[in-house]
């Protein structure tokens, strides 16, 4: 018999996965550069997604009452992508910029996910891969 606790993707997703960053061009491992990330099924990410959907639905209702459609600029879409990636970051190691080590703070996470879209893409892709968060 299988115990459902062994299939709890929400808990496993919040525990995290150590993502080994890859070079954006040649896909070689960037030695020492790792980001611990939450999975898409984690409670934290699910709560973020619910909040985002509720906000967008509310905005859409208000605009609909004014006979307007909900649209987004490229900057708004990028900001949403950055926020969605940032909520998945738990911690990191080996991340530096300009010769200085970057501590894993909310400000630095937002900065890195904004400036280095390839890192943001890797975080999102690894977060979506359920195998990375398979409960033991």
Regions found by a protein language model. Give the residues of each.
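Short acidic, Pro/Gly- and aromatic-enriched capping/linker segments at domain boundaries
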Residues: 11-24
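Short, intrinsically disordered N-terminal pre-domain segments
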Residues: 1-13
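Short, surface-exposed, charged amphipathic helix/loop patches that serve as local interaction elements
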Residues: 29-136
């Amino acid at each position: 018999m299988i115990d459902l606790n062994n299939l709890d993707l929400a808990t496993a997703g919040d525990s995290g996965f150590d993502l080994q960053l890859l070079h954006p061009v040649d896909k070689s491992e960037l030695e020492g550069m790792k980001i611990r990330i939450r999975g898409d099924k984690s409670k934290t990410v699910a709560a973020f997604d619910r909040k985002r959907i509720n906000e967008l639905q509310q905005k859409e209702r208000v605009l609909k009452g004014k006979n307007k459609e909900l649209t987004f600029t490229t900057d708004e879409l990028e900001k949403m992508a950055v926020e969605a990636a940032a909520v998945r970051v738990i911690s990191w190691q080996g991340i530096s910029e300009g010769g200085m080590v970057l501590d894993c703070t909310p400000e630095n996470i937002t900065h890195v996910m904004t400036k280095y879209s390839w890192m943001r893409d890797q975080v999102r892709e690894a977060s979506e891969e359920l195998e990375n968060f398979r409960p033991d």
